[in-house]
């Protein structure tokens, strides 16, 4: 008979993963609400206690303990056991360590612990209180993985360990982050709740005001603590504790003496030093980790004129000197993961301790009653000692003697066993007195235990007494200080930036960089690092305190503070915008670039699209947005994928000239174009024919303009030939239509003259040497000096720039800008 079953993979996967999820939720990653331990932690403590590896004995090799735990209770690999053991020994992770370890058990710098064959471990004294009375049937036991031995499913827990040491873990669909607390405060809250089971959060917080991290630091936000204590979820600010020390020469240094919980100190020091190296905030001279056996100490030495408060606020905001700690208090309660506040945690703990105390009392009472029964028999024996001795001597053996005692004197089986095994020296008069005293003590003990079992008040008084004993023995002062509200960090961004001279360059394809004046001066303009198929469209001297706007052919604008640009040598290629701007397209190009000081002036830009739209938009629309480092924003809306921007530039109240591909030119005043929002569409710029598109647009602030056709014909036309009309008209023809090989506009623009302001590029132009570079389809480069061109009639087709260009046709054309500054 075949055992093969046909089942749905979907059903199998769902059922199996469901089982697996249930296992890791209940038996791996989440703590029990009663003892605050995960299964691996519980097994470590129980196994070490079972092997008498306790605080009052000598240390034992960690490897031996790990082997016993793995072999008997936790068959999941030695590394997971050892890692859990090490964490329980780290006093910067636990408020009260449960394992004491000799040797390297890691560090706050994230150093790994020594291998378990080198370290030694034993239970701490306070861990013994978690296991106290476990031998008295106080907690349920279950079979281990191979049914050879039983292990506890929860520990007796003489103190609320879940709150004292907290917990962190991730399982399937659940995670937990419970912060550690001060032992004395937790016990005070538990004692109060024993007397007041319906206590409110506000009252409990008088005893337990907030977490107490082993690394100290400052916790800010009492309202968030209250919210977390009510719901199990909340967020507080944890800030490092710092001091300001005076140094020689009028300098100061910031000294960090406590850092937030779970922060890697070495990484923190490195991040602070990175701030210094990258000059993110001015004034840091040196960063030193001066921590030693006496405690944590990080020194940040400042320069003489540094703004100490500014530096400290910057480090709080941009490094882990200050973090947000997120409460997510999830624990296993009755086999179910629950998000709990401190009331359910304390209630569950008190209910658990009630069961432990009652079970222990029943165990002790039963044991005392058995002993009392035997003591009563022994006292009775002494009063008839001679008869009993004679009876025993007359018996054949031990069993016969026991039977004779039961028959002749009505002793019970237990009493008869105690009598026949009694040593003769115990029959002295002194021992009789001892037995009588023991009887009285046993009766008193039984009465007390009966009172505990039968009276809730007596039982709870004992619970409070035991908790107070733990507090008295192990209480330590609070390490973390509490503040009512999180202090807002205010940073004047401008004051963070050291003002330096630099040169900014941008290429058409989107490579940007800033270059030091030294590197710039050591090279020629032509030596700029770039791709062979790319070209420089912008280079200008600037200050690191200024801003950079880049307008693209797809209607996007990209913002960069100049100080954030990578400082790269002039001969290196630079950083491509796609490395940081996630929505920068492969076919996107930079059209216009400008350096500016501020965004709140009245500057407006005009933008013209290929499909005939025009708009004006204000500069203030581009005030730096939150995601500027990774995303561009729109400055013009395109109609479809075939549309693109053909012109964008700042403009005042000038006329603008638009030139279409089929040779029409239209001139009108920019006031006809409304100022709209950055995301809004424009208005109709020109009445284009069905097969026509806009090819160029420029500001009418010179006396002439040039026009280049796709066949390589170039001409210069007086601006007066284009009469000003209004927008949305067809315009005037600026080319004569031919039947064969008609000319089509490739590029048009203003010819520079004195007083000219470049409308496409901020690069300064030599008005006496404005050269147009034309590249043919075959790669040949032709140069034409625009100032040398004679004025042509409006309807002429101009002159070819070369005898061969007509057959080759134009592939690319652009003005050669010349930097006049330092070059």
UniProtKB/Swiss-Prot annotation:
GO biological process per UniProt: chromosome segregation; DNA topological change
InterPro entries: GyrA/parC_rep, Gyrase/topoIV_suA_C, Topo_IIA-like_dom_sf, Topo_IIA_A/C_ab, Topo_IIA_A_a_sf, Topo_IIA_dom_A, TopoIV_A_Gpos, Type_II_DNA_Topoisomerases
E.C. no: 5.6.2.2
Membrane association type: Peripheral membrane protein
UniProt-listed SUPFAM superfamilies: GyrA/ParC C-terminal domain-like (SSF101904), Type II DNA topoisomerase (SSF56719)
Molecular-function annotations in GO: ATP binding; DNA binding; DNA negative supercoiling activity
Alphabetical UniProt keywords: Cell membrane, DNA-binding, Isomerase, Membrane, Topoisomerase
UniProt entry tagged with the keyword Repressor: no
Site location (Interaction with DNA): 38, 74, 76, 87, 93
Cellular component aspect of the GO annotation: chromosome; cytoplasm; DNA topoisomerase type II (double strand cut, ATP-hydrolyzing) complex; extrinsic component of plasma membrane
Activity control: Inhibited by quinolones, such as levofloxacin.
Compartments where found: Cell membrane
UniProt-recorded name of the protein: DNA topoisomerase 4 subunit A
Protein encoded by which gene: parC
